[in-house]
Amino acid sequence: MRIADYSVTKAVLDRHGFTFKKSFGQNFLTDTNILQKIVDTAEIDQNVNVIEIGPGIGALTEFLAENAAEVMAFEIDDRLVPILADTLRDFDNVQVVNQDILKADLQTQIKQFKNPDLPIKVVANLPYYITTPILMHLIESKIPFQEFVVMMQREVADRISAEPNTKAYGSLSIAVQYYMTAKVAFIVPRTVFVPAPNVDSAILKMVRRDQPLIEVKDEDFFFRVSRLSFVHRRKTLWNNLTSHFGKSEDIKTKLEKGLALADIKPSIRGEALSIQDFGKLADALKEVGL
């Protein structure tokens, strides 16, 4: 019997008198086939260390621990720590860290792996309410995570992996794909969770690029330009740029020069621009003094 088997999950929760907290976005997976599929998608073996976020009662952790060199699981809910000590008692390659992943000193933590030189993969069922902040925090950290295989709300997975000229494409697609390739591996129906969430989930596989997708003069400015270009999706690029930078004649002249330099039409919408286009635009706007 597995932790994820519904009868086992229910018995564990009843034994420990556990009640779900909405504030932590807790939904526990009760489908062993899906858990095996997650591990297979992540290609976990004895030559990989894994960081898990939000292990819950250890359903995914159990599968990870059977396959990985070591698992470090970050759990914010104090009440789950003794439960994890119970459900994972047979494993000597799991460390449970009772901490918010956004506040953890990851550089120090990863040194606690017995073999810290092994590649690190992030495999997790992320809480819906904080998916994007966690992902961006990890991606932008200086830690060379090789790969992410994470479950999230289907809509967010679609946005992250979206291509230009699609409804889902936006600044989040650009922010992630600048650093990583991103592809939806498979869909997880809401019916396999306790309690069931209101929407379906998706497993997103992201692999870190050897270097960012494009080279830009100023990364912060590049991300700023991409974000502001989607503030009002139905507005043209020109309208979004002037809303942000201003509408004085001097600013307008600089914007016109920058757009001409990047060979981008002012009447286009942000969703039509590729990451490469945004790179050219940001560099051109920087060059004209914005």
Swiss-Prot record:
EC number, as in UniProt: 2.1.1.182
Reactions catalysed according to its record: adenosine(1518)/adenosine(1519) in 16S rRNA + 4 S-adenosyl-L-methionine = N(6)-dimethyladenosine(1518)/N(6)-dimethyladenosine(1519) in 16S rRNA + 4 S-adenosyl-L-homocysteine + 4 H(+)
Record gene name: rsmA
Top EC class for this record: transferase
Family statement drawn from the similarity comment of this UniProt entry: Belongs to the class I-like SAM-binding methyltransferase superfamily. rRNA adenine N(6)-methyltransferase family. RsmA subfamily.
Binding residues annotated for S-adenosyl-L-methionine, in chain numbering: 27, 29, 54, 75, 100, 125
Compartment list: Cytoplasm
Any one annotated GO CC term: cytosol
Swiss-Prot/TrEMBL keywords: Cytoplasm, Methyltransferase, RNA-binding, rRNA processing, S-adenosyl-L-methionine, Transferase
Pfam families found in the cross-reference section: RrnaAD
Stored SMART domains: rADc
Entries under HAMAP family matching the protein: 16SrRNA_methyltr_A
Entry GO MF terms: 16S rRNA (adenine(1518)-N(6)/adenine(1519)-N(6))-dimethyltransferase activity; RNA binding
Transmembrane regions: none
Protein's UniProt name: Ribosomal RNA small subunit methyltransferase A
Record InterPro entries: KsgA/Erm, rRNA_Ade_diMease-like_C, rRNA_Ade_Mease_Trfase_CS, rRNA_Ade_methylase_Trfase_N, rRNA_adenine_dimethylase, SAM-dependent_MTases_sf
Organism: Streptococcus pyogenes serotype M18 (strain MGAS8232)
Function: Specifically dimethylates two adjacent adenosines (A1518 and A1519) in the loop of a conserved hairpin near the 3'-end of 16S rRNA in the 30S particle. May play a critical role in biogenesis of 30S subunits.
